[in-house]
């Protein structure tokens, strides 16, 4: 579920993996492993992504279906 949310958020923002990876200061390959579920997302990266997409960490993790942060 997390992988789908990451991809959906990125696509809804009309961004490619390279752009998000640049924001995070990592390679596109490294970021793509988060989207595919090959690697777990470190907490600090999760927090950065939530801020970047203006959503909650719970939404990205699939704990909540509420997209807007509370």
Predicted regions and their residues:
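Conserved amphipathic alpha-helical interaction elements at protein-protein interfaces in regulatory
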Residues: 8, 12, 52-55, 66
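Recognition helix of helix-turn-helix/homeodomain-like DNA-binding domains
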Residues: 25-40
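DNA major-groove recognition helix of helix-turn-helix/homeodomain DNA-binding modules
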Residues: 25, 44-59
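Short basic helix-loop element that most often maps to the first helix and adjoining turn
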Residues: 4-23, 48
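Short, charged recognition helix plus adjacent turn
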Residues: 12, 33, 44, 61-70
